[in-house]
Amino acid sequence: ESINLADNFAFTGTVTGAGGVNTPAFAARINGEQTISHNTSTKLTLNTEIFDTANAYDTSTYRFTPQTAGKYYCTLNINSNANGQGNFRIANAQIYFNGSLAYISGYDKATGYENNGRESLSAIITFNGSSDYIEPYFYGYTQNSGNITIGGTNTYDSQFSAYKIIE
């Protein structure tokens, strides 16, 4: 006899071997505002955890160091503002892996500058489960060398997150 997988099934007992979990996982956000200097890659102070299933995100170093090896889906979303300081020429979300720039979003405008930016970056990153880590960074270049503000009234606009992919 064969099973029709399109049917509905009612189980008693425990079903095993189905699904999986996407942990460790975390999400962190900025609490307030951070000022970034023009033409400088700066680590973001995303110091408020939304959740952290394995205490793998450090709110003082802004590092995610998972202790479970595998592939992770990582995201960085940034709300930035050039404060009317000549507007953005370049704005990049950046993820550093083990202290070096590894992933970067692309925003580079030769004309028609913007004062506000929303930079998003996602990457699938393999971690060794012991010492590998990622950190959130931002790079901005304004038309007249003015400072940039990250965060603001809705601090959930700037977030950093990751979760383990079920393999």
What is the predicted function of each stretch?
Residues 1-19:
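Register-specific beta-strand positions within repetitive beta-rich fiber domains
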Residues 17-167:
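Extracellular jelly-roll beta-sandwich "head" domains, especially the C-terminal globular C1q domain
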